From Swiss-Prot:
Keyword terms of this UniProt record: Cell membrane, Cytoplasm, GTP-binding, Lipoprotein, Membrane, Methylation, Nucleotide-binding, Nucleus, Prenylation, S-nitrosylation
Record's protein name: Dexamethasone-induced Ras-related protein 1
Species name: Homo sapiens (Human)
Coiled-coil residue windows: none
Binding-site residues, GTP: 31-38, 78-82, 145-148
UniProt subunit comment: Forms a ternary complex with CAPON and NOS1. Component of a complex, at least composed of APBB1, RASD1/DEXRAS1 and APP. Interacts with APBB1/FE65.
Length: 281
């Protein structure tokens, strides 16, 4: 599919873009109020930090990538720290593919909320996949934000290690500062590696392109695809091979669309398992 045509469809008046389910993912950010969830999202999308605090009800963003000739869609769901609607919280978890749980190092209550959230994610996902929570694989990182306020720290390192466990493939922990932009790139790289997604999705590993440069992006994507077909590389992780565009006016999908998304993902996972069972060694 031509990337120029793709970007034209990103306007709200046009129909939804059709990208294969295997290339569509959703990143969900969860945590208490005032821990810095929106600041992390802002760093991810724009590289900027907004010092003013505005309470989030629920913010939805969408980003498209061209990576080595493939087009990817990443939805970003910035959830509310207050959850008056448990059903919506559960739906957010069900539709999530990768998770960032955020607490503030200077707020013990927010750490305890992350403990509850992690358990809720494991319980919800294990129910969906018909597995025990010990066996369900959910790409998840826990972030202790406000590392620049270490003097006011209320959470002990040993408690964090106990929560995270000793398997970095299941859960990773990062102490970050969204304000100082500290350790965020490493955190995103680890999360995408855990989910087996292209590392170029991390903000520091692709070029940011605005919508008005879609023709340039399309030409570069075609060039990279031709190089790949010719066996000339393109898979080395060079930022020149990857481009990202934040979709303007992205709208949260309807509940019906979310339910269809869950169904499609579950069906794709089931088919992959069936293929594994049919392999003759």
């Amino acid at each position: 599919m031509k990337l120029a045509a793709m970007i034209k469809k990103m306007c709200p008046s046009d129909s939804e873009l059709s990208i294969p389910a295997k290339n569509c993912y959703r990143m969900v950010i969860l945590g208490s109020s005032k821990v810095g969830k929106t600041a992390i999202v802002s760093r991810f999308l724009t590289g900027r930090f907004e010092d003013a605090y505005t309470p989030t009800i629920e913010d939805f963003h969408r980003k498209f990538y061209s990576i080595r000739g493939e087009v990817y869609q990443l939805d970003i769901l910035d959830t509310s720290g207050n959850h008056p609607f448990p059903a919506m919280r559960r739906l957010s978890i069900l539709t999530g593919d990768v998770f960032i749980l955020v607490f503030s190092l200077d707020n013990r209550d927010s750490f305890e909320e992350v403990q509850r959230l992690r358990q809720q994610i494991l319980d919800t996902k294990s129910c969906l996949k018909n597995k025990t929570k010990e066996n369900v694989d959910v790409p998840l990182v826990i972030c202790g934000n406000k590392g620049d306020r270490d003097f006011y720290r209320e959470v002990d390192q040993r408690e964090i290690e106990q929560l995270v466990g000793d398997d970095p493939q299941r859960c990773a922990y990062f102490e970050i500062s969204a304000k100082k932009n500290s350790s965020l790139d490493q955190m995103f790289r680890a999360l995408f590696a855990m989910a087996k997604l292209p590392s170029e999705m991390s903000p520091d590993l692709h070029r940011k392109v605005s919508v008005q440069y879609c023709d340039v992006l399309h030409k570069k994507a075609l060039r990279n695809k031709k190089l790949l077909r010719a066996g000339s590389g393109g898979g080395g992780g060079d930022p020149g091979d990857a481009f990202g565009i934040v979709a303007p006016f992205a709208r949260r999908p309807s509940v019906h669309s979310d339910l269809m998304y869950i169904r499609e993902k579950a069906s794709a996972g089931s088919q992959a398992k069936d293929k594994e069972r049919c392999v003759i060694s």
